[in-house]
A protein has these predicted regions:
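Mid/C-terminal beta-alpha module of Rossmann-like enzyme folds, strongest
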Residues: 207-275, 291, 296, 304-325
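Substrate-positioning beta->alpha
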Residues: 96, 147, 175, 192-212, ...
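NAD(P)H-binding glycine-rich loop region in Rossmannoid oxidoreductase-like domains
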Residues: 35-42, 46-92, 100
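N-terminal Rossmann NAD(P)H-binding glycine-rich loop of SDR-like oxidoreductase domains
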Residues: 4-24
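Short-chain dehydrogenase/reductase
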Residues: 87-91, 127-130, 134-149, 166, ...
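Conserved catalytic-site region of short-chain dehydrogenase/reductase
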Residues: 78, 115-124, 167-173
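Conserved beta-loop-beta element that borders a ligand/cofactor-binding pocket
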Residues: 149-170
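Conserved Rossmann-fold NAD(P)-dependent oxidoreductase catalytic core, especially the SDR/UDP-sugar
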Residues: 89-140
């Protein structure tokens, strides 16, 4: 079995990647920046390694002897005040990691990008041949993910890129689980008018491992899931939890106006608002993703949303994240 290097291992997708890699018999060195991350990584069978994406020398030492890099770390902030930090992590960090991988003679670089690299500026169903417009986007998350992906595509290393859509599943503490907790507490002020493609975090991790095993170098894979409006999604959550929910969607213009109002307040408080103009724009977008290439070449599975949501809610209950029923 191989020795590999993983970033983002203490996060949502990264934790599942770590479990899949360890389960397949690989030795996983995982980037860690704190004692809490050390413990989380060790609990899943990984070897925590202290290094920083902003320090190429520390990365080169950490990568020595590794056959592959799985890069899943990212800054997903939707607040413009975090743009410089986000660019440093997503773009500069990826470039540093690529350079370190070349120096260490790593054989493959597997990069978790995002469907956001295509940007909300794209309309219709996205396929791997759809031109990416993240470089034109005013949303820094989209812009930074686009630039990071381009850096990977330009490297002489053998590479594979993955573009997951809305990731859901057990282990989610900070993504869609935040919305689910608002529904559970009946504090959701409104529902965005967009459409999402809900992807199973477990299947994303399995697809990445298969892509490496099958040496699908030079390929990009969209990893989507069942399409659903956010109204439909929230109503399914409400029904499963026995909670009332808003009946319809908040108009995009009203959501954006609310986000701008919160942004004005944030100038004085210095605290990141619950809704930002960037977040309002993305959740008002009608995202449609074609995963047929991944299904065909990686045996990727689009888990039905009701099943995926059921697993997510069961895990959240087991973690005490939902009110007792």
């Amino acid at each position: 079995m191989s020795e590999v290097f993983l970033t983002g291992a203490s996060g949502f997708l990264g934790g599942h990647l770590l479990s899949e890699l360890v389960g397949a018999g690989h030795t996983v060195r995982a980037l860690s920046r704190s004692e809490a991350s050390d413990a989380a990584i060790a609990a899943l069978g990984g070897q925590p390694v202290r290094a920083r994406l902003g320090d190429p020398d520390s990365l080169a030492a950490a990568l020595a002897g590794c056959e592959a890099v799985f890069h899943a770390a990212a800054d997903t902030s939707m607040w413009k005040r975090n743009a410089a930090r986000q660019t440093a992590t997503n773009v500069d960090g990826t470039r540093h990691l690529l350079a370190a991988a070349q120096r260490a003679g790593v054989g493959a670089f597997l990069h978790t990008s995002s469907v956001s690299a295509y940007s909300h500026l794209v309309h219709g169903t996205i396929t791997e041949t759809t031109p990416q417009r993240g470089g034109e986007s005013w949303i820094n998350y989209e812009h930074s993910k686009y630039l990071a992906e381009q850096a990977v595509r330009d490297t002489p290393l053998p590479w594979i890129v993955f573009n997951p859509s809305h990731i859901l599943g057990p282990g989610d503490r900070h993504n869609w689980s935040r919305l689910i907790r608002l529904v559970d507490a009946q504090k959701l002020p409104g529902i965005p008018p967009g459409i999402g493609a809900f992807a199973d975090v477990r299947e994303i991790a399995r697809a990445q491992l298969r892509a490496w095993q099958r040496q699908r170098y030079g390929e990009c894979y969209l990893l989507g899931g069942e399409q659903a409006s956010f109204v439909d999604f929230v109503h399914r959550v409400g029904a499963a939890l026995g909670r009332r929910t808003p009946r319809g969607a908040t108009p995009a213009w009203a959501l954006m106006a609310y986000a701008r109002l919160l942004g004005t307040v944030a100038r004085f408080t210095g605290r990141e608002p619950d809704v930002t103009p960037e977040g309002a724009a993305l959740t008002s977008h009608q995202l449609r993703v074609d995963s047929s290439r991944a299904i065909r070449e990686l045996d990727y599975v689009e888990t039905p949303l009701d099943s995926l949501l059921g697993d997510t809610l069961a895990w959240m209950r087991s973690e005490g994240m939902l009110a007792a029923r």
